[in-house]
UniProtKB/Swiss-Prot annotation:
Name the record gives this protein: N5-carboxyaminoimidazole ribonucleotide mutase
GO biological process terms, semicolon-separated: 'de novo' IMP biosynthetic process
Binding residues for substrate: S9, D12, R39
Family indicated by similarity: Belongs to the AIR carboxylase family. Class I subfamily.
SMART domains linked to this entry: AIRC
One MF annotation (Gene Ontology) recorded for this entry: 5-(carboxyamino)imidazole ribonucleotide mutase activity
Catalytic activity: 5-carboxyamino-1-(5-phospho-D-ribosyl)imidazole + H(+) = 5-amino-1-(5-phospho-D-ribosyl)imidazole-4-carboxylate
E.C. no: 5.4.99.18
Gene symbol of the encoding locus: purE
Family matches, as HAMAP family: PurE_classI
Organism, scientific name: Vibrio cholerae serotype O1 (strain ATCC 39315 / El Tor Inaba N16961)
Protein's pathway: Purine metabolism; IMP biosynthesis via de novo pathway; 5-amino-1-(5-phospho-D-ribosyl)imidazole-4-carboxylate from 5-amino-1-(5-phospho-D-ribosyl)imidazole (N5-CAIR route): step 2/2
Keywords annotated in UniProt: Isomerase, Purine biosynthesis
NCBIfam families according to UniProt: purE
Length: 161
């Protein structure tokens, strides 16, 4: 596995599956796991501290509410951690965004947008990071970007179907 996709609870999967789907497009291997910062802190510590030795290169961590998972993951590993705020009913994910983005100096978490777009972009960003040293993955990322560009160029008039 190259990327770890972790989430605070199973209910976060409808959001986090978009990271997995993006990684599938680029042929990047990943694992998925529920790892709660609050309910299973020892599991989190074990998961994050062993990630590099297990072959992971990037960890995508999605969480809602207090959203301590990405920051605590980053505290236990030197790997890049990408945080995805999961949208909640109470505050629409803003609480999660603030929890993830406001990390203290010295413990970095790359924070993405709230919800589905953030999860998909976390998958894309993970592929870009891996692509730095993997030409095959980078080629697929570049083809993805070119396809997006061509789609806009092929449909410049919003009034046409």
């Amino acid at each position: 596995m190259t990327v770890g996709i972790i989430m605070g609870s199973k209910s976060d999967w409808p959001t986090m599956k978009h990271a997995a789907e993006m990684l599938d497009q680029f042929g990047v291997a990943y694992e998925t796991k529920v790892v709660s910062a609050h309910r299973t802190p020892h599991l989190l510590a074990d998961y994050a501290s062993s990630a590099k030795e297990r072959g992971l290169q990037v960890i995508i961590a999605g969480a809602g509410g207090a959203a301590h998972l990405p920051g605590m993951t980053a505290a236990f590993t030197s790997l890049p951690v990408l945080g995805v705020p999961v949208q909640s009913r109470a505050l629409s994910g803003l609480d999660s965004l603030y929890s993830i983005v406001q990390m203290p100096k010295g413990i970095a978490v790359g924070t993405l947008a709230i919800g589905e777009a953030g999860a998909a972009n976390a998958g894309l960003l993970a592929a870009q990071i891996i692509g730095i040293h993997n030409p095959e993955v980078m080629s697929k990322v570049e083809a993805f970007r070119a396809k997006q560009t061509q789609s806009v160029l092929d449909n410049p008039n919003p009034a046409e179907e």
